[in-house]
Amino acid sequence: MRILGLDIGNKTIGVALSDPLGITAQGITTIKRKGEDRDIEELKAICDKYKVEVIVCGLPKNMNGTLGPQSEKVLKFCNIIEEVINLPIKMWDERLTTVAANKAMLEADLSRAKRKKIVDKMAATYILQGYLDRISK
């Protein structure tokens, strides 16, 4: 069963995909946002191509666990994804995933330009891997 992981931002959507057994996550692309309809179209194409059965979306909570304005945007977009693509959506607490992704890239000594290109895809990978680890227990 393939599972898609998403890190949804205002300008980009990081996308990660599980292996067929649902054990490991791998970043596959970063979608540059071009409007709701086109974003959904791209996500649907990815879901169709890889025969995705579930989508895990990172939910950006505040450090105290409350939901802020960005969370509301993400929840609204995820509701639209669920309606249009017709796949179940699971929300995953994404606190500190971008921080962890940036830290890993700094430790790998990647340049700022290279980090900027892949940070969202890496954050999506962290989100999806966290979910996969949880469901495998």
UniProtKB/Swiss-Prot annotation:
One of its GO terms (cellular component) is cytosol. InterPro entries: RNaseH-like_sf, YqgF, YqgF/RNaseH-like_dom, YqgF/RNaseH-like_dom_sf. This is Putative pre-16S rRNA nuclease. Its EC number is 3.1.-.-. GO terms for molecular function: nuclease activity. PANTHER family: POLYNUCLEOTIDYL TRANSFERASE, RIBONUCLEASE H-LIKE SUPERFAMILY PROTEIN (PTHR33317:SF4). Belongs to the YqgF nuclease family. It is found in: Cytoplasm. Its main location: cytoplasm. One of its GO terms (biological process) is rRNA 5'-end processing. NCBIfam families: RNAse_H_YqgF. Keywords: Cytoplasm, Hydrolase, Nuclease, Ribosome biogenesis. Could be a nuclease involved in processing of the 5'-end of pre-16S rRNA. Signal peptide: none annotated.
